[in-house]
Amino acid sequence: MLKLLVLGVLLHDVSLSGQDEAPPKADGIPGEPLFNYASIRLPEEHIPFFLHNNRHIATVCKKDSHCPYKKHLENLKYCWGYEKSCKPEFRFGYPVCTYIDMGWTDTLESAQDIFWKQADFGYAGERLEELHVLCQPEEPHDSSLLCSRYLQYCRAANLYLDLRNIKRNHDRFKEDFFQSGEIGGHCTLDTQTLLSEGQRKSPLQSWFAELQSYTELNFRPIEDAKCDVVIEKPTYFMKLDAGVNMYHHFCDFVNLYITQHVNNSFSTDVYIVMWDTSSYGYGDLFSDTWKAFTDYDVIHLKTYDSKRVCFKEAVFSLLPRMRYGLFYNTPLISGCQNTGLFRAFSQHVLHRLNITQEGPKDGKIRVTILARSTEYRKILNQNELVNALKTVSTLEVQIVDYKYKELGFLDQLRITHNTDIFIGMHGAGLTHLLFLPDWAAVFELYNCEDERCYLDLARLRGVHYITWRRQNKVFPQDKGHHPTLGEHPKFTNYSFDVEEFMYLVLQAADHVLQHPKWPFKKKRDEL
């Protein structure tokens, strides 16, 4: 009976402990709130969804005269979409499909459902459905290991890591880093099931290489004083993609956000440990973003070398390059866009980084052109295009170059979020489209024959996307000079026909003006 009770706790108590899950005060001090509501730190729109999954906080709020969220208590039916009790009409948005991709399905309704499961909160729901116990505790304070399919996500209690004999080299994701007995817990291990989950073994696709040596220990790591260090705070382990490339690094952040949903915890009173088996550091041009997820500096795994370290609560986060994951090389059904998941991610990060919407002012459409100081994919007639834009009085035009040494990432986000039409050549800088306002349009000036990358990202975020169509009106400097592949369209610079450019920009402007969320809804005849 005890074994069944413990198993039930594992499968149903999905949240990590943290600030937003801290128990309310039993006897409130007169004049003081019964709960630290400031620790929730979520956008106002997200509060009813949070309260839906944290009914204990909703109950306290109802009794507490100091609760700032009382107006949301009438909306507790609102849900993200992955909850089993969630009714479709109360979901946090639902994709829009405009045509049927016959390669996937034959109705618009099924297309919506496919897209929702591929790239929206249905994706988080599928990960929750996959969870199964791999190491079962016998007593309430034993260790445990719970994972999704292919070990893409795992959660562990009382995890033991022995780093006393670790050998590091240049390999960031060494597969045999831990030997038997060096990682594990005091629980009953289902070895056969664990070892059957290795089909997607790959550094940034699965935690199989790291957990295949998980061992059923004959001691209780913490209670038997087998740890040199005990980490009390909930800890997220992450294997990170390239920190110098916004497209790749934000695959890390998006998957961390999805992981928070799977855990039902958005607390920042957590540690994040970068799982890196090398002795190298990590170059991170977007480190300000971590402030949306943790109150502390990111910890390198090597910090714990030569020690036995025990983690009371540990999560192995969803990874940035998972097969059928989000959002690197994700095969998406065509004809659908607008995921609540990516809109919520954008709102979450902007809110926690204190990036606010400051306009538009006087109804003018704010156009931002992203210039490039790199060797390739420059706009050769950029000044000519800008001068043409400035002839339209309703456009407010600025040129930016997001050089990290000259413009900090938070300042970059402020510019992006206060842009209505974002224009740039194919490149990682277009990942900024994640933080455009809902009514905005992104204009990938030329996609360099990589057609899906930023089109799909715009579809996920739900902002309008356009790109250059007429090949006879774009003029490459030459055929391109890839260092090993020879001719390549990404390795040259381009000029553009001014009239065609203006036609496309005005199309984007028309979309902005017609968008239901555009703050100035009256049409501008000047355009």
UniProtKB/Swiss-Prot annotation:
Its main location: endoplasmic reticulum. Glycans are attached at N354. Keywords: Endoplasmic reticulum, Glycoprotein, Glycosyltransferase, Signal, Transferase. One of its GO terms (cellular component) is endoplasmic reticulum lumen. It holds the Pfam family Glyco_transf_61. A motif (Required for optimal activity) lies at residues 295-297. It is found in: Endoplasmic reticulum lumen. This is EGF domain-specific O-linked N-acetylglucosamine transferase. It comes from Canis lupus familiaris. The lineage of its organism: Eukaryota, Metazoa, Chordata, Craniata, Vertebrata.
